Amino acid sequence: MMLGDTNNRFSASRAVVVLASGLLVGLFLVALLSQMLARIDALDALTQMRLATTLQNLIMFMLPAVAVGTLCGGGTPLRFLRLDKAPSAMAVAGIVLISLVMTPAMNWLVAWNASLSLPEAMKPVEQWMRAQENAAQEATDTLLSGSSVWDLIASVVCVGLLTGLGEEMFFRGALQRICCDGMRRRHLAVWTAAFVFSTLHFQFFGFVPRLVLGAFFGYAYLWSGSLWVPVIGHALNNSAVVAFMWMGNNSIDAAAMDEAGSQSAVVAIVSAAVTVAMMVAYKKILANGKKTH
């Protein structure tokens, strides 16, 4: 199956190779640059982590996505990634409202996934997975360890805005677009991109909620036709985590908001049901909006 316009045909398989190669090369470069940053005594651990995260978003995610967009989009990567289309007010309002409504269900899913354990025969695998989870959590704790207003702003920019943009460019703008054009099965493309998105975070005890979140962003992208919609949703989700961590660093109790619904299956079920209903309505509203333009 070919991608791109009639003047620039590019196979889906080659596009995946370019995207994956860019990710691997970017991973190597970021690891190398991170080691160099660690040797600079003038930089504290928090600053090093912010710089490393920024480099990761730019080199591992944004550049490969732009490369694929350039090759498949006839030299117009913004158009291929759907970054050239401003989202409608309804599309933005919808993803914000749905994100709020789905929070209890997502919190319950996070708690459930974190409580899972593997059979005794697979304990070594579970121990390795827990070690990966703990390492990721330690990195997150370091990245979000600041308590000043400047720390809050810097974390929102780095973790909220840059990560939201970078990951959506890679996983939805590039990977999901390639899968949609190559597979010709939109639902399969959404869930394939979401699966890769969750897997590459290497946080196995948060795999299911991140898979669901990735699919949510994928459908928002699919229905709206603008990558800015999932970028906004992703940035808001990450920024909420940043805000809760920052409040905790300042001894402000935000547990009631951060853990809403995590202990109640009934609340989670109601949240999930309302979320599904809102997404069905969201799809119809966006489809009708496209017909009127």
What are these regions (language model features)?
Residues 2-25, 50-51, 76-130, 259-271, ...:
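Interfacial transmembrane-helix boundary/kink motif in multi-pass membrane proteins
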Residues 29-74, 89-100, 120-132:
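Alpha-helical transmembrane segments in multi-pass membrane proteins
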Residues 31, 235-293:
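C-terminal membrane module of polytopic membrane proteins
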Residues 53-60, 133-162, 262-273:
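Hydrophobic alpha-helical transmembrane segments
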Residues 196-202, 206-260:
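Functionally important transmembrane alpha-helices
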